[in-house]
Amino acid sequence: RATVVEALVDGGASELLEEGDRIRPASTGERNDLYARHASPLAVEAGGRALAAAGVDPAEVTHVVTASCTGFVSPGPDLALVRELGLDPGTARLHVGFMGCSAAFPALRTADAICRADPDAVVLVVCVELCTLHLTASDEPEQIVAMSLFADGAAAAVVAARPASGPVLALDGFLT
C-alpha cells in the first residue's frame, strides 16, 4: 500500500499515533497540509511518465486537466504540472475537484471534448488521490473495506485527436 503518512510507514514519524500505536484522527488542517506537500510531486511524476510513454514533447501540450477529491491546495497540481514539466505558461488548465472516486471519468470526458473541438489539442490528464490522509481507526466493516481498497497515488493519460504512432485507447463514451 502506498501512503504519504509517515506514521503509517515502518520506522516513520509518530505525529499521528496515540499511546498504544492507535491512529488518532488527523485534523482537517493536518490532512490538507500533507495533501499540499505531496499531491503535486505525485502528479508531476505521473504526468512526466505519461508524456514520455506517449512520446509527446511537453511543448506540444495545450491543456492540462487534473482531478482529485482527497484534498485541496491553490495553486494546485495543475500549475505544478505546467511549471515543473516545462509546459507553455499559457497552457489552459482545469481542475475537477471533489467528484469522488470516479473523477477521472469527467476529466477524461473533458479532455475528449477539448480534442473533438480542436483536433490539434493535446491534453494531459492527471488524477491524484491521497486516500490514506483520511484513514480512521474503526472496526466498522465499511471503513475496513474502504481502507483496504484505496491507497495514495496518481495516474495520467495523454489525450489527442491526432494519429498516434503506437498503440492507443479510444475514448468511446462516458456514463457517469
Regions found by a protein language model. Give the residues of each.
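Generic secondary-structure signature for well-ordered alpha-helical cores
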Residues: A52, V56, G86-L87, A113-P119, ...
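Conserved beta-strand elements of the Class I
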Residues: T62-V65, V122-L124
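Phosphate/pyrophosphate-binding loops at sites that engage ATP/ADP/AMP, CoA/4′-phosphopantetheine
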Residues: A46-V61
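Condensing-enzyme catalytic core mediating Claisen C-C bond formation in acyl metabolism
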Residues: R1-A36, V122, A137-T176
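Glycine-/small-residue-rich "gating" segment that lines the acyl/pantetheine channel
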Residues: T91-R109, R116, L130-S165
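Conserved catalytic cysteine-centered active-site region
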Residues: R22-P25, E30, R37, P41, ...
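Conserved nucleotide-sugar donor-binding subdomain of glycosyltransferases
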Residues: Y35-A46, A50
